[in-house]
Amino acid sequence: MSKDDEGSLVRSLFNLLSGTFFSRLTGMLREIVMATYFGADPLVASFWLAFRTIFFLRKLLGGPILGLAFIPHFEFLRAQNISRAAFFFRSFSKFFCYSAIVFTLVIELGLGVWCSCVTGSLFDTLLLTIILLPSGIFLMMYTVNSTLLHCEKKFLSVGLAPSVVNVLWIGTVFLARNYNPRNRIFGLAIVLVIGFILEWAVTLPGVIKFLGRSTETPKERDSIRALIAPLSLGLLSMGIFQLNLLCDMWLARYINEVGPLYLMYSVRIQQLPVHLFGLGVFTVLLPAISRCVQDNEHQQGYDLLRFSLKLTVAVMLVMTMGLLLLALPGVRVLYEHGVFPTTAVHAIVEVLRGYSGSIIPMALAPLVSALFYARRNYKVPMLVGIAAAVANIVLNVIGCLVFKHVSVLAYATSLASWGQLVILWYCAGKSLPTYKGLMWRTFRESGKTVFTTVLAAFITVGINVFTNTTYIVFIHPLTTPIKPLTSLLDQCGVFFAESALFLAILFGLAKVLKAEDLMNLTSFQYWKGHQSILRN
């Protein structure tokens, strides 16, 4: 294995982001095509509710938690003997494959009985869930294979794999656009199952190549029992977290029959910066930090984490302010086409602005958790995550009953996310004195970045007011547009013009005020991992 430093970290991150960006781009295209041809009605909302339920059931079996438990233990075994590590992966893979199959069969039986007792939109939701549920087996195996490929620094194929599903999704929606609404929704569900099988198949070559390097049977065989305790905590945490997300969807349906659609489309946009960059940094950082801990290179681990925190804060600040400023023109570009109504666009924007406050803590929390996972201490982040999820559910229920607006669910999520980050870092400082104060140091050093970004946003809005173009960023503008923004060309023109204005002001101010973290983001060498740029 090559030595882990800032340069290798960024090169791995670059590879991961390249694949993930393409997958997210195709994912965004599928959202546009869905909105344009399928619109916003209760049947489409039932599809999204079923789709979210599938991921809830899949993550009950582990989901991303598998990587958090597997990677540090795998790196520990590989440092001693690659044959032990390979044997352990085979056992790990078989266990979760068989578990996923049994789990799917049991749930399918239960849903079949329930489906025979209901009618209406609930029947549609359950039937769509029954159709989609087998894809959870292949989603699980894709996740298992991805954990191994991350350790092998094969990030590009893992990031690209979901785009296979998205391309099939887009093609199916386009070809079925003139079919009966009910038939096309159920047909899409069947095609997606095939897509998830292909997504899993993309990861097979890398896994086979690794296993081919270790053909001998190790003298010492390691059981996955070593991961049972941390996985149990992880599954409990993930189960409550996913219950929280599912609760959001059902509460949104309680408030508005199309509420799940508003929530799903806004979450997809909010997750773009978090998953594309925040979790991308974490995915690359965890194996690197784990190796630093195994080799007792604590100073190098400190430097890597500090670098990752500063980089993530700078990017997420820009993303947060950009989301607040560009929510309306961005949602118009994505969704306000074909049969998708303007009222749904405004509802998505309101929810999206509520989620904007969660971008920074959601991106930073996994980086802090890496400190615990690297030492195979899973209890603290899991318990903190459980507490945050429970608090979020309570806030959601209270907000739903008091305000009866879908956007309140997003604001509750943002509030709970900040609470989780604060508690998580407090625990990290108590148990890991070496890293104590690093988070606060990062925020202090990012003060100029915060000031510059906020100032750029205010100047941008000021220019909108001065030029009578507040209709671009406000749902209720101070002035009405000269002509309605109904064509894609007009919507794209407005969005890119507003984006260019904000970014020009932002990076112009960064240069004047010498905000180095922002200036570094415009450096190509910075992203390619050149040491001289990184040290500056």
Swiss-Prot record:
GO terms for cellular component: plasma membrane. Keywords: Cell inner membrane, Cell membrane, Cell shape, Cell wall biogenesis/degradation, Membrane, Peptidoglycan synthesis, Transmembrane, Transmembrane helix, Transport. The chain crosses the membrane at residues 31-51, 54-74, 95-115, 122-142, 155-175, 185-205, 226-246, 269-289, 311-331, 354-374, 383-403, 408-428, 455-475, 493-513. Its main location: membrane. One of its GO terms (biological process) is cell wall organization. It is a multi-pass membrane protein. Pathway: Cell wall biogenesis; peptidoglycan biosynthesis. It is found in: Cell inner membrane. The keyword Cell wall biogenesis/degradation applies. InterPro entries: Membrane_Transporter-Flippase, MurJ. Involved in peptidoglycan biosynthesis. Transports lipid-linked peptidoglycan precursors from the inner to the outer leaflet of the cytoplasmic membrane. Belongs to the MurJ/MviN family. This is Probable lipid II flippase MurJ. The gene is murJ.
